[in-house]
Every structure is written in C-alpha cells, then in structure tokens.
Amino acid sequence: QPHPNEFVGLM
C-alpha cells in the first residue's frame, strides 16, 4: 500500500 507521503512526492 503506497503511503500518503509517497503520493505527495509525485506531486
């Protein structure tokens, strides 16, 4: 499961 922090990194 991808962490929310990783999602922010994509942004």
Curated annotation (Swiss-Prot):
Main location: secreted
One Pfam family in the UniProt entry: Tachykinin
Cellular localisation: Secreted
First and last residue of the signal peptide: none
One GO term describing the cellular component: extracellular region
Residue positions where Pyrrolidone carboxylic acid is found in the record: Q1
Organism superkingdom: Eukaryota
BP-aspect Gene Ontology terms: defense response; neuropeptide signaling pathway; tachykinin receptor signaling pathway
Keywords of this entry: Amidation, Amphibian defense peptide, Neuropeptide, Pyrrolidone carboxylic acid, Secreted
Tissue-level expression: Expressed by the skin glands.
Keyword Transport: no
PTM-bearing positions, type Methionine amide: M11
Family: Belongs to the tachykinin family.
Main function: Tachykinins are active peptides which excite neurons, evoke behavioral responses, are potent vasodilators and secretagogues, and contract (directly or indirectly) many smooth muscles.
UniProt name for this protein: Kassinin-like peptide K-III
